[in-house]
Amino acid sequence: YPRTDARVLSSAVAKEIYKNIGGLNNYTPLSGFANEIMQGKKYQGIIKSKYVDDKKITDHYAIIPTGQAVGSLSRISEMGQKVYDVIARRFLSIFMPPAVYLKIKLETQTKGEAFFANFKMLKHPGYLKVTGMGGQKKEAQLTEEQIHAISSLKKGMPLPVKDYTIKDGTTSAPKRYNSGSLILAMENAGQLIEDEDLR
C-alpha cells in the first residue's frame, strides 16, 4: 500500500501484532531481536502506546512487515531489500525500551575565562540496537579511557588544563531539501514562524 502516510497502527492490527513479529523470526538479520521481543512478550502493551491510534488512520495504517515470504527477498532488487530492512528494523524498534544517554556539560574556568564542553554518551542502547543508529560522531571519537574519565567527574571538581588548541571553523548552509524533507517542511511550515500573529 505505497500511498499511505500513516505513522500509526489500528487497534485491530495491534491485537495480532505478535504474528508479524513472529514472522520476522525467519528474517536472519533481525531474528534475534524478533525472538527477544516474542520471548519477553514486549508487544503486549502496544495497544495503549502512541503507535496505535484509530483516529489518525485515513486510508491505511502504517506500513509494517508481515514476515511472510521472507525467503523471497533474494528475488527483489538490492534497493528493495534495503527498504524492507529499514521498515522491519523500524517496526521492531517500537517494542524495545528507549535509548538512555548520559549528558555531561563541562564548564571550566581559567584566568577569568570560562570554557564549555558538552558530551553525550550512550548508556543503554535500547531500540538503537535494532535500528543500528547508535554510533554518534562524538561518541565514536571517545576512547574507553576518556569515557571512564568523563563518567567519574563530579560537580565542582578542579581539573588541570594540560593542553589546548584553537580550531578555526565556519558555519555551513542548511542542507538542501529533498522530496521527503520538503513534504515534512510543508506539513510543519508554521513551526518555523516565530511571530505568534503570523503563525
Where are these regions (language model features)?
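Core catalytic DNA strand-manipulation module of type IA topoisomerases
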Residues: Y1-R199
